[in-house]
Amino acid sequence: MFKEFREFALKGNVVDLAIGVIIGAAFGRIIDSLVNDIIMPFFGALGGLDFSNYFFPLTKGVTASSLAEARRQGAVLAWGNFLTVAVNFLIIAFVLFLIVRSINTFRKRVLKENLEVTPPAKPQDVVVLEEIRDLIAARRA
């Protein structure tokens, strides 16, 4: 059983998937930093807003002005944090769209070049018929 698991785990697809997940997690952290440390503060400076502390208290006991303190006091609806995460998602989705689009364009270009370079081979029956035709034409001449 261990041997079967080892063979499964070391297949190319499983290893490729694991590498993709690790790279994806690292990419997610980069995007989080981009949104939290660059994009959202920029919008905050323009409008004087800090989205990270925007929330609606869901209980009457919540009187704090920061999200961390409000969460300690009771239930809150942290819509500012949700907005930040939604922006993260949109950026990741857009970057992935650009990557997939460029890969598809590259594949189409390579496929088109390969089709232009190598003409399709004639089927064997057509080749045999052409040989027969040529032999008949040679006998008549």
From Swiss-Prot:
Highest taxon above the source species: Bacteria
GO molecular function, a single term: mechanosensitive monoatomic ion channel activity
SUPFAM superfamilies: Gated mechanosensitive channel
Entry's transmembrane regions: 8-28, 38-58, 80-100
Membrane topology, record value: Multi-pass membrane protein
Family the UniProt entry places it in: Belongs to the MscL family.
Name assigned to this protein: Large-conductance mechanosensitive channel
Species, as recorded: Beijerinckia indica subsp. indica (strain ATCC 9039 / DSM 1715 / NCIMB 8712)
Lineage of the organism: Bacteria, Pseudomonadati, Pseudomonadota, Alphaproteobacteria, Hyphomicrobiales
Gene coding for it: mscL
